[in-house]
Design a protein with these regions (language model features):
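Acidic, small-polar-rich N-terminal luminal/periplasmic segments of exported/outer-membrane proteins
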Residues: 25-166, 616
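Outer-membrane beta-barrel translocator/receptor signature
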Residues: 129-132, 144-222, 229-235, 327, ...
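Repeated loop/turn-to-beta-strand initiation elements of outer-membrane beta-barrel proteins
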Residues: 195-198, 232-237, 340-343, 384-388, ...
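C-terminal beta-signal and adjacent terminal beta-strands/loops
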Residues: 678, 748-754, 773-821
Length: 821
């Protein structure tokens, strides 16, 4: 509360009101008008840490307003592909917690603070109850935030603000096919007019699903209190709590091209057989008809024929379940020292408790984890005079008279001055993560989904013995996991190989940063940022074999983030920019913790995941900002994490174009297009099997067994799971008498399911439409999602394409009633 004390001491001071082009904006946070979708109508201070218009931000950025979130029906991390370029997201493990940007898991921020708690997009689903708008920024996070391994981009969730003018309330209820039931209550207003205001939002869901045995039950509460005791100080306290019980949906297994094209599914059960046909036991089966170096607990499938599968029949046992509880709290203080100086302090607490449990013995547990962070920023905005007309010839003039002569006819200061926007600060983050997973025993292809779903199960005995066994998680009944460390006997026998996910870690991150935007002229500006982090980590293995001490490891590492940018206003309506960004980051374990290498140490290469980004673009603002167009092209080097395998370097090229047009309050249109070329050049990626056919005995397959992780030969591989091209469009029109229509389209180019492209999802499209009527304080709305009932598919995981594929939702009708008071 240092800023509060400073504000108290300055309470009797009067803040200067002299004009200046670089003066700071008032502390009051201004939002967009309710139906405005134009990025040009507000600043994006949380994108780069400075109060900049979207045309001045040297990066590709999308601003998704409340109006767009509602009309495009944004409910999950995947739905951003409906409204923004380069945001196609796989169904990672059936319920992604993070959006993908430019083909990689994106960072998620909460009012400019990294939430964390995710690895490869696995974690608690995004809770939109607290969200007012979303900034989607392409490329690594800037110096003020520090980069992570997720350098494709980040989304920043901007929370709801209190109502300071009068009391407002809103009740929403949505009902839809497949037993969908969602509801929200939102209210707030001033407590002390002009001084103290609040807002509270509650949302809940009690929904079934189109998919067999899948459901969602959630409760969320958000509250914010804003106190403005003086004109130069503001305190905002907020808390977002969410609890969700849901089902992990991993899609359909045995993804052949015939399944994708025609819905044809190969039937048959896992059989433990050898070449003579003699049955054998499950613990060390000689089930592979082709020799392998991994005689693990796996089997082969004896095909019995083919059938047209019901797309609702997914890999879910009725006894499977998932759970997540999150709590994010912030205290945001703003102290205006003068027109040109402001202190901003953001204190954050994050809590996560989650688990995912499948009867096929995929499990993930985070129990619990929490983060404490405090970031202090000093913003200094000044005009530095370089030259101006001499007034020495007028010595008899007073100071005020000289000031008048020092202005031109427009009121602007004559001469040349350099504008400077400076942000410097300190950041401390403490993180505690306890996380255990078992990713070694997921035998997806061995289950026949046309049979009783209760048979989707792996016996506990089969994961407790054999190679790389699982162990009971201490203090958590019914959960088993494999170690994060590697355990070898004195004779050299490997008992366990570290899974790269399980970790019990304590981490402290100390950082300092500086950002400086120098406006050399009204047209030309340079922007520099640098941040240095000192990261200390203590690791202990949460599970380990009997007779062994748990593996421990410690490290202290330095990380750096540097970026340089230039913007040039070609015309009043056109701005060009170029950016270069270099960063190093750590390799994350599950739950946002840190994993160790196969040598049971923190390997230096795991803290040298380098990223280089070169990006250039043009931004246009026509008709007083009512038409906004942005284009960008980029080249980036980065690292791609693999499940249970080393990260891989990747080079990507791409381009994006976005258009926002809103000529009046009745109509708006958004369009976006992106092209991405993510290539792993001369790399040897790992994959669950060489082909889906490895699971089947000849003549249908090779009979090598499943799972049977292979390392592919070195070569050039297109990253699977991501379309090279994505296009979306959204149109909305409302008549003056209240009737309105909305339309949305999303088109994806072919998507490889595997690295070799043996199975390909073809070009697909999804069309959504809605009709609504607004009368006074009531809105009635009907949405038809996928109204052409396309039988679309999506990737579940970038390296599990031989095991599973996700059937997208069919046509669905939803009805919403919204009442405001």
């Amino acid at each position: 509360m240092l800023l509060l004390l400073l504000a108290s001491s300055a309470g009797g001071q009067t803040v200067s009101t002299s004009s200046g082009t670089q003066s700071l904006t008032p502390v009051t946070v201004q939002g967009l008008a309710p139906n405005n979708i134009l990025p040009t109508s507000t600043d994006v201070s949380d994108a780069f840490g400075l109060d900049l218009l979207v045309t001045d931000v040297p990066r590709s950025i999308s601003v998704i307003t409340k109006e767009e979130l509602q009309n495009a029906n944004i409910q999950t991390a995947r739905d951003f592909a409906r409204v923004s370029a380069d945001t196609y997201t796989p169904y990672f493990n059936g319920n992604p917690s993070s959006t993908y940007i430019r083909g990689q898991v994106a960072d998620t921020f909460f009012n400019g603070i990294r939430i964390g708690f995710t690895s490869e997009g696995v974690g608690a689903p995004i809770d939109f109850n607290a969200v007012e708008s979303v900034d989607i920024v392409k490329g690594p996070a800037p110096a003020v935030y520090g980069a992570s391994q997720d350098v494709g981009g980040f989304i920043n969730l901007i929370t709801k603000q209190p109502y300071s003018d009068a009391f407002h309330s809103e009740i929403d209820a949505t009902f839809g096919e497949y037993n969908e039931n969602r509801y929200t209550i939102d209210f707030g207003g001033p407590i002390i007019p002009g001084k103290l205001s609040y807002r509270v939002s509650y949302s809940g869901e009690e929904s079934g699903s189109f998919y067999r045995n899948v459901f969602t039950q959630s409760q969320s509460v958000y509250a914010v209190l804003k106190w403005t005791p003086s004109s130069n100080y503001e305190l905002e306290l907020l808390n977002s709590f969410s609890e969700i019980h849901y089902e992990l949906n991993r899609g359909i297994n045995r993804p052949t091209q015939d399944l994708i094209d025609n819905g044809t599914y190969i039937t048959g059960r896992e059989e433990f057989v050898n070449p003579t046909g003699t049955p054998i036991g499950p613990n060390y089966p000689i089930s592979n008809l082709i020799p392998t170096t991994i005689p693990q607990n796996r089997g082969v499938v004896v095909p019995t024929g083919t059938t047209q599968i019901d797309r609702a029949d997914v890999i879910v046992n009725p006894n499977d379940s998932s759970y997540a509880k999150t709590d994010y709290a912030e205290a945001i203080q703003r102290l205006t020292l003068s027109d040109n100086a402001q202190l901003l302090d953001t204190a954050y607490f994050g809590y996560l408790n989650r688990w995912q449990l499948g009867s096929y013995h995929y499990s993930a547990l985070v129990e619990p984890s929490y983060t404490l962070e405090d970031r202090l920023e000093l913003h200094l905005n000044n005009d530095v005079p370089v030259s101006r007309p001499s007034l020495d010839r007028e010595p008899e003039l007073s100071k005020d008279e000289k000031s008048v002569l020092d202005k031109d006819e427009t009121g602007e200061t004559e001469g040349w001055s350099i504008g400077n926007m400076l942000n410097l600060g300190l950041d401390f983050r403490y993180q505690r993560v306890y996380s255990v997973s078992d990713i070694s025993h997921s035998y997806n292809n061995l289950f026949d989904l046309t049979q009783n779903p209760s048979l989707i199960s792996v016996p506990l005995s089969s994961i407790l013995g054999g190679k790389n066994p699982s162990y009971a998680v201490p203090g958590v009944n019914g959960f088993y996991g494999t170690p994060g460390g590697t355990y070898v006997t004195s004779s050299g026998k490997v008992i366990n190989t570290g899974n790269g996910e399980s970790n019990d870690t304590w981490a402290e991150d100390y950082a300092a940063f500086i950002e400086d935007r120098i406006s050399v002229t009204k047209q030309l500006a340079f922007f520099f940022g640098i941040r240095g982090d000192i990261l200390h980590i203590d690791f202990i293995d949460p599970v380990h074999p009997a007779g062994f001490n748990p593996v421990t490891a410690h490290t202290t590492q330095g990380l750096i983030n540097v970026n340089g940018n230039v913007t040039y206003q070609l015309f009043p309506w056109a701005t060009a920019y170029f950016t270069y960004d270099y960063s190093t980051s750590s390799t994350d374990g599950q739950g946002g913790g840190y994993s160790i290498g196969s040598d049971n140490k923190f390997d230096n290469p795991d803290f040298r995941n380098g990223s280089d980004l070169y990006e250039g673009g043009l931004k246009f603002s026509f008709f007083d900002g009512k038409l906004y167009i942005a284009t960008a092209g980029f080249r980036q080097t980065r690292s791609i994490p693999q499940e249970g395998a080393p990260t891989l370097p990747e080079i990507i090229w791409g381009g994006e174009a976005e258009l926002n047009f809103q000529p009046n309050r009745n109509f708006y249109m958004t369009l976006s297009y992106s092209y991405l070329d993510p290539v792993l050049a001369q790399q040897a990626p790992s994959q669950k099997e060489s082909s889906v056919l490895a699971a089947f005995v000849p003549p249908v397959g090779t009979g090598s067994g499943s799972p049977n992780t292979v390392t592919l030969p070195p070569g050039n591989y297109l990253q699977p799971g991501i379309p090279r091209q994505l296009f979306n469009a959204n149109l909305n029109y409302v008549f003056d008498f209240g009737l309105g229509f909305s339309f949305g389209a999303e088109i994806t180019s072919p998507i490889n399911l595997t690295y070799g492209g043996s199975v390909v999802i073809p070009t697909q499209f999804t069309l959504n439409a809605g009709v609504f009527y607004r009368w006074k304080n009531v809105e009635l709305r009907v949405d038809v999602l996928n109204f052409t009932n396309q039988q679309n598919w999506a990737v579940v995981s970038t390296n599990n394409g031989t095991n599973q594929v996700y059937p997208e939702m069919p046509l669905q009708v939803q009805g919403t009633i919204r009442v405001k008071f």
